[in-house]
Structures are given as C-alpha cells and as structure tokens.
Amino acid sequence: MQPETQSSALPAYRFSIAPMLDWTDRHCRYFLRLLSRQTLLYTEMVTTGAIIHGKGDYLAYSEEEHPVALQLGGSDPAQLAHCAKLAEARGYDEINLNVGCPSDRVQNGMFGACLMGNAQLVADCVKAMRDVVSIPVTVKTRIGIDDQDSYAFLCDFINTVSGQGECEMFIIHARKAWLSGLSPKENREIPPLDYPRVYQLKRDFPHLTMSINGGIKSLEEAKEHLRHMDGVMVGREAYQNPGILAAVDREIFGADTTDTDPVAVVRAMYPYIERELSQGAYLGHITRHMLGLFQGIPGARQWRRYLSENAHKAGADAAVLEQALKLIADKR
C-alpha cells in the first residue's frame, strides 16, 4: 500500500517534491508542508554509511512532515535493509532507493545512476528492503546512462527490478545521465527530456505505479503528465518558486480548500523557528528555503534581499521575517 493523504482518496504520490541534495532538508520540508497538506515530500539522499556510522541523527524529521519518504543512497543489500528497518521504526512512509544521481561522489560510493548498469544488484537491494519492512520501497532512476540509452535497456532494467526485486513503484527522471563529463547540474539540463518514452514505459508496464520527473515547471504541466502517469514529481521549480504549491491540494488532489496564503505560511513558521533557534539552529539555514516564496509578487526582490542580508546576523529571529513581510505588504 502506498501512503494516502489524510483528506484525499488520491494517493500521496500523485504529486511529490523531489529529493534534492542540500535543499530538501527538514527545515525545507516543514516549510513546504505548510503550503500543501497533500504533497508527498522526500528527504535529501542519505547514505547508508551516514546512518550506520555517522554521529548525527540523519533520520530526524518533524511529525508535521507526513507523508514523507526517506531516500537512501547505497548498494549493499544488508546495509540498505538495516537502514530501511530503522526508517520504518522512525515512522517514515516510504523508502526510496537512489538510482538516478550522477554525481562523482555518489559513483565513488557505488550508488546513484551508475547502479542502472547493474539491474540485478538493484533488484537485490530492493528485495532485501522489502523483506524487512511493510512500507513501500520505491526506486528513482533515469531513462538510461551513457550509451546504454535504448528503450530495450530501460525495459530490461524495469523488468528485472520489478520482477526479481518486487519493486512496485518507479519514479522516472525523463533524461539519461552521463556518468562522466557532465556535472550534476549539467546532467539536470543538458541531456534532452524524453517524456514520450516515459509515457510508453507506463503503457508497457500498466501493473506498475510510475511517476514522472524532470523539467516540470507548472501545475498545468503536471496535470498534462497525469493524463499519462500515476504521479508527478517536481524538483527545482518547487524549491525556487514554492508558491506554486499553494494550489496543489485543490488543483491536483481535488481538495475542497482555498489556496494557501503565503503570508500566513510565513507566520505559521514562527513557532517552528523559535523552537529550532532555542535548540541551536541558525535562522539563515531555515529562511534560505523561503527566499522564492513571493516570486512574481511585487516586493519579492526586496523580500529576498532583506532575508539574505539579515538572517545571518547575531540574534536574528522570527522578527526578521515579520519585518521582511512589510516589504511585501507595502506592494500589495
């Protein structure tokens, strides 16, 4: 069973926010949750090594974040199974295996997109996790790697991981990945998008649940993809222009609600900010995720500038945001 949202008959995976390294941390996810009650949120990729050997609590999250999925990076079935059990015990709603990140530091650890070249190992990893948890185990991948970019290669990968790994849900980034020669940023922009190939994959594997990811910039585009796919995952646009999430519950999930007011969202962050600051957090680490909230609204530039210049100062607290809001209110 996939996690369902609290107030909708539609599954949470219908619309999700992509796992993004250095971006979708727990502060970011708490903020995004205030914009949409329904959207499925993903953590940044967390490696099995960090969870098993790291000194920090890499599984920390706020209860308010649900539904929330943990994305794991790794390629050792036993270690992945161990981490999946820990994550389920902590209350995560889904475990996702990263088979799409092309970063050099990821390849060196033998996980991410390079795993696409070893479908049997991916199947073994998924099966090991499925055997020890009852929550969904999903895979996020690309449509190919390097010169292994034929449709037959992609189908063989899906066949192996769904058949032998018993994976029932895939999130497909509609680009291939170059494992050398391109930076992670270039790998998100240079390989061309091929949405029709992902649509065809869903038609050829109708029994599997599939979400599409890559280059999606509006809810209108998301709704078009949902004519072909089970779910849509949005990445950079949702981070850089989070205001688009204000209408997700109504437009994507059919909820009988009014769209979220961004000013109210900012003020709803104040108790969280006060709590985090009291535990040693730094305001700038929270507000950096909120800079794009008013994109397209008069005063947005002043909002960004004020936060950027003041959130890092000693003693900065929620009053900084309240002052920044006046720059928006003056323009409304």
Swiss-Prot record:
Pfam families attached to this UniProt entry: Dus
Record EC number: 1.3.1.-, 1.3.1.91
Source organism: Salmonella typhi
UniProt binding sites for FMN: P19, M20, L21, Q71, K140, H173, N213, G214, G215, G235, R236
Family to which this protein belongs: Belongs to the Dus family. DusA subfamily.
Catalytic activity field: 5,6-dihydrouridine(20) in tRNA + NADP(+) = uridine(20) in tRNA + NADPH + H(+); 5,6-dihydrouridine(20) in tRNA + NAD(+) = uridine(20) in tRNA + NADH + H(+); 5,6-dihydrouridine(20a) in tRNA + NADP(+) = uridine(20a) in tRNA + NADPH + H(+); 5,6-dihydrouridine(20a) in tRNA + NAD(+) = uridine(20a) in tRNA + NADH + H(+)
Residues annotated as catalytic: C101 (proton donor)
InterPro entries membership: Aldolase_TIM, DUS-like_FMN-bd, DUS_fam, DusA, tRNA_hU_synthase_CS
The protein's role, per its UniProt record: Catalyzes the synthesis of 5,6-dihydrouridine (D), a modified base found in the D-loop of most tRNAs, via the reduction of the C5-C6 double bond in target uridines. Specifically modifies U20 and U20a in tRNAs.
EC category name: oxidoreductase
Record-given protein name: tRNA-dihydrouridine(20/20a) synthase
Residues the UniProt record annotates as site (Interacts with tRNA): N98, K185, R188, R301, R304
GO molecular function, one term: flavin adenine dinucleotide binding
Keywords: Flavoprotein, FMN, NADP, Oxidoreductase, RNA-binding, tRNA processing, tRNA-binding
CC cofactor: FMN
Stored PANTHER family: FMN-LINKED OXIDOREDUCTASES SUPERFAMILY PROTEIN (PTHR42907:SF1)
